[in-house]
Amino acid sequence: MKPVIETHALCKSYHSRPVVDHLNLTVPEGCVYGFLGPNGAGKSTTMKMLLGLVHPTGGSVELLGHTLNEANRIALLRQTGSLIESPSGYLHLTARENLSIVADLKDVDRKDISRVLEIVHLTKDADRKVGQYSLGMKQRLGIAMALLGSPKLLILDEPTNGLDPAGIQEMRSLIAVSYTHLT
């Protein structure tokens, strides 16, 4: 299996304090990986570097067989779905309208919106304003945004953050179902 993510001596420091220190990571295609560690260990920073949202202090990132750089970042991100820390969306718009914006940004056919709404069980609430959603519904909308366009790579940072035990179990099941839709 070829790797979908590779890092080589990846580093990030803030004010001379190393947060990520020479990380070498290989994630093969078709695998599910997770980062575990205490707050401040660099998990979110690593994921942001994988997406080109934070520039590393040193080292390199390869996504889908290409070294991540400014010239190819947008093209690689169009093949990647992500949810970093907490879902973002326009609260005054409906879920369907939010997904339409993301579809346009990712250059994805809007017909895919119905598919991802069904996967995350938001079809019946698709035309409600996101500001009326519970935290769990917002998390599911974030997963739907990440799944638009059937990405080759899915990066989720704390997708169960702030959920109660039932919500955590629901999100884990949703992630497992989402994974089967990627492979």
Which residue stretches match the model-derived regions?
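Helix-to-loop junction immediately C-terminal to a conserved catalytic motif
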Residues: 51
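Conserved ABC transporter NBD signature motif
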Residues: 59-69, 75-76
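Conserved ABC ATPase "signature" region
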Residues: 100, 104, 110-125
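Catalytic Walker B motif of ABC-type/P-loop ATPase nucleotide-binding domains
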Residues: 154-158
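Conserved small/polar residues in nucleotide/adenosyl-binding loops
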Residues: 180-183
